[in-house]
């Protein structure tokens, strides 16, 4: 009977060894799979860190480029208007040189008036800069500054009788009010 028990014990031990070996193999397989997964995740983290750093560098380069473009825009924003001003200066120089030769005041006055009209016309058309403040206009305190006042008979509305300095507006925004003398009714 002892032989049977020993045989049974041996079979039981053999079965337990098989279970134990299978369990160890399974654990080893799980460890290998876990190690592979850890390696994959570490690689993915490394790739994401690298991508993050590259995107951060790209963004910094973009920000610097945008700042440089903004600086250039501000620096050269008035280039078009400066080209027009240079043309006006050329015309003034021609008028002055011509009047030095001929000593003709009337021609100088005509030339300067033509240059003024050219300047006002180009500034109006290209830049929407308008001059205002004429004799006979109704006085508007938002557009005109009354430097002096005189009284007149039978005026319905205060009006401009003399302009000391013209006013200018740019895109409907007042740059400078016109400085004027205003007539108002005595009544």
Swiss-Prot record:
Keywords, in A-Z order: Chaperone, Cytoplasm, Stress response
Gene Ontology CC: one annotated term: cytoplasm
Segments passing through the bilayer: none
Residue ranges, annotated region (Disordered): 1-31
UniProt-listed PROSITE patterns: GRPE
BP GO annotations: protein folding
Localization (cell): Cytoplasm
PANTHER family: GRPE PROTEIN, GRPE PROTEIN HOMOLOG, MITOCHONDRIAL
HAMAP family to which the protein is assigned, alphabetical: GrpE
Protein name: Protein GrpE
The gene coding this protein: grpE
């Amino acid at each position: 009977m002892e032989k049977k028990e020993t045989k049974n014990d041996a079979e039981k031990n053999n079965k337990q060894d098989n279970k134990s070996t299978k369990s160890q193999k399974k654990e080893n397989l799980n460890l290998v799979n876990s190690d592979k997964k850890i390696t994959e995740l570490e690689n993915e983290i490394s790739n994401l860190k690298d991508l993050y750093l590259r995107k951060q560098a790209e963004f910094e380069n973009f920000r610097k480029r945008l700042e440089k473009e903004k600086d250039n825009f501000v620096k050269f924003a008035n280039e078009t208007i400066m080209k027009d001003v240079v043309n006006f200066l050329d015309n003034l120089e021609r008028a002055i040189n011509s009047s030095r030769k001929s000593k003709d005041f009337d021609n100088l006055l005509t030339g300067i008036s033509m240059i003024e009209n050219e300047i006002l016309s180009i500034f109006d058309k290209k830049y929407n800069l308008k001059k205002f403040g004429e004799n006979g206009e109704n006085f508007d305190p938002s557009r005109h500054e009354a430097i002096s006042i005189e009284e007149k008979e039978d005026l319905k509305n205060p009006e401009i009788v003399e302009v000391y300095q013209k006013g200018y507006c740019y895109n409907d925004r007042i740059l400078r009010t016109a400085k004027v003398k205003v007539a108002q009714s005595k009544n």
